[in-house]
Amino acid sequence: MDVDRLQEALKDFEKRGKKEVSPELDQFLCHVAKTGETVVQWPQFKEYFVFKLEMVMDDFRTSAPEQRGSPNPNVEYIPFDEMKQRILKIVTGFNGTPFTIQRLCELLTDPRKNYNGTDKFLRGVEKNIMVVSCVYPSSEKNNSTSLNRMNGVMFPSNSQSYTDRSNVNGPGTPRPMIRPKFSLSSPMNTNGLPDSTENKESDLQQKEKSQSDSAVSDDGSQATTSRNKHSAEDSAEVEEHEVKRLKFDPDEEEEAACANPDASSEVSAEMAEEAESASTSADKGKESCQTAQASDEESLMTASESTEAESNERDSENVSVTEESSEESHHMDQSEESESACSLTSDEHNSTAAATTSTEDADPSEEEHLATSSGKSTETLTLSPMENSEEATDAPEEPMEQD
């Protein structure tokens, strides 16, 4: 929207003696109703805004007269003229643009959109003007004046406790000039402000509560362990009481038998049946034990027989091995004896030949001496194989002794 044309239109409206509606200014009000942006300052378009508001209220009354029925008992009835003067007085008292300017422009440009009755329309306007906060136009934001304004109150320009943003329609809480900067090391809460002493105290209280809770939990755990111990002791005591009760049951049964003979006879019959069942079970247990012992003995006998058979087989194998070794040694001895016998026979032939040659010249006594020597040699030959055979028979007996 062209600001220069708007300012010229506002100046022309102020210069006119007879106030009339301006299409350019109506377009400005429609722009504010749609966007909420006031291009010019409040004092510049304040006069036209009041004129337009008064005209709309009058038109609304002529087109929609006051209700003829009884008024609402929950609402105070105020005449139209009085309500109109009250509204105009509040609006003319503004020194800044109220922050409800967009809604007020909507009511001025299209008054019958939400209201049909005059009294309701006036109450809607009154509700929107009963404010003190202000809004800035775009030009006022860029070129703010040195005056700190509120609607109804003016502050000097050298005031340091208020800024230009403290532009409210009435007394309010101004903002400080400069916000203090806090270091990052200081603790910050969720709103970006440092934690106060109250927050610190609350943190300390929470820590103390957590410590106390942990101590309580430890005490609870100790209590549970002690309860478990007590429960175990109680169970042991209960078992002891049951054992004692079982011991004292026979005495009680005897007393009951003396008191009630019929009951005692029944109890004795039951005891006899239990004894018979116990004896039968004992007999069955004995039979099972005997069968188990017999099976164990049979298994032991079979194991001993198998070990004896294995030992006999091992002995027979050892005997066969020794016999084979003795036979081999006997054959070796026989071969050696045959070789020695052959050598001896050859020697004898040589000696006999020499003897025959010598006997021809020798005496008969020498012949006898040779005959006796030859007989002795033959005896020694016959004895030597016998000794070898005895040694061979003695040799296999040694491994038997070792086994």
Swiss-Prot record:
<dbReference type="GO" id="GO:0019888">
    <property type="term" value="F:protein phosphatase regulator activity"/>
</dbReference>
<comment type="function">
    <text>Regulatory subunit of serine/threonine-protein phosphatase 4 (PP4).</text>
</comment>
<feature type="compositionally biased region" description="Polar residues">
    <location>
        <begin position="140"/>
        <end position="149"/>
    </location>
</feature>
<feature type="compositionally biased region" description="Polar residues">
    <location>
        <begin position="183"/>
        <end position="196"/>
    </location>
</feature>
<protein>
    <recommendedName>
        <fullName>Serine/threonine-protein phosphatase 4 regulatory subunit 2-A</fullName>
    </recommendedName>
</protein>
<feature type="region of interest" description="Disordered">
    <location>
        <begin position="140"/>
        <end position="403"/>
    </location>
</feature>
<feature type="compositionally biased region" description="Basic and acidic residues">
    <location>
        <begin position="197"/>
        <end position="211"/>
    </location>
</feature>
<comment type="subunit">
    <text>Serine/threonine-protein phosphatase 4 (PP4) occurs in different assemblies of the catalytic and one or more regulatory subunits.</text>
</comment>
<dbReference type="GO" id="GO:0005634">
    <property type="term" value="C:nucleus"/>
</dbReference>
<feature type="compositionally biased region" description="Polar residues">
    <location>
        <begin position="156"/>
        <end position="170"/>
    </location>
</feature>
<dbReference type="GO" id="GO:0030289">
    <property type="term" value="C:protein phosphatase 4 complex"/>
</dbReference>
<dbReference type="InterPro" id="IPR015267">
    <property type="entry name" value="PPP4R2"/>
</dbReference>
<comment type="similarity">
    <text>Belongs to the PPP4R2 family.</text>
</comment>
<feature type="compositionally biased region" description="Polar residues">
    <location>
        <begin position="212"/>
        <end position="226"/>
    </location>
</feature>
<feature type="compositionally biased region" description="Polar residues">
    <location>
        <begin position="371"/>
        <end position="387"/>
    </location>
</feature>
<dbReference type="GO" id="GO:0005737">
    <property type="term" value="C:cytoplasm"/>
</dbReference>
<dbReference type="Pfam" id="PF09184">
    <property type="entry name" value="PPP4R2"/>
</dbReference>
<feature type="compositionally biased region" description="Acidic residues">
    <location>
        <begin position="388"/>
        <end position="403"/>
    </location>
</feature>
